Each structure stands twice: as structure tokens, then as C-alpha cells.
Amino acid sequence: AVAKLLAAADVTAALEGCKADDSFNHKVFFQKTGLAKKSNEELEAIFKILDQDKSGFIEDEELELFLQNFSAGARTLTKTETETFLKAGDSDGDGKIGVDEFQKLVKA
């Protein structure tokens, strides 16, 4: 669903760059996919897709499945990748990423 908002070639390249376990780097991924150039409104729409349980936050279970939002056949993130991703985005320390935190993380 997220892939519809991005160029297919960019998504493919970004996913290729993190096929191996523990190779995911959110900053690189956001740059390669073009997410880093999206407006806050576009990022909010993407956030709502990533927030699969519609809680208003992206929790670790949803982060683990992050890549699959871009391609159904993509791998899940490892525990280490998920923890690193969460730590990078969770600026208030509540153990989850809100929409404002997500926007800041993507644009960082």
C-alpha cells in the first residue's frame, strides 16, 4: 500500500539494499525510497498505513513488519533492527512511535 505513494524503482532499490538480516538502515531506506522528500501530510498518510492496528502509534510489532508494507515478499526486520529503529524514532521514550515522531525520523 505504501509503495503506491513512491516510485516502484526506488522501492525496489531500497529493498534490495537491505535484503540481508541486520542490513536495514532507516536513514538509507528513507532516502532511497524518496520518503525523506515527502511532505508531512504524505508522511501522515504513510504512517496510517504502517499503524496497522490503528492505535495512533507504530509499535515494535508493526516495525518488525515495516518492509512488508513496501513489498509483500519482503523480509521482517530482525529484533536488533526493530529495536534500533524504535529507539531512533521514539523521542519521548514511551516505547512506540507517534506520527510527529515518525515525521521527524523520516526527515532527520
UniProtKB/Swiss-Prot annotation:
Ca(2+) 2 binds at D90, D92, D94, K96, E101. Keywords: Acetylation, Calcium, Metal-binding, Muscle protein, Repeat. InterPro entries: EF-hand-dom_pair, EF_Hand_1_Ca_BS, EF_hand_dom, Parvalbumin. GO terms for molecular function: calcium ion binding. CDD domains: EFh_parvalbumin_beta. Ca(2+) 1 binds at D51, D53, S55, F57, E59, E62. Residues 38-73, 77-108 form the EF-hand domain. Gene3D superfamilies: EF-hand. It holds the Pfam family EF-hand_7. Belongs to the parvalbumin family. In muscle, parvalbumin is thought to be involved in relaxation after contraction. It binds two calcium ions. This is the predominant parvalbumin in latimeria muscle. This is Parvalbumin beta.
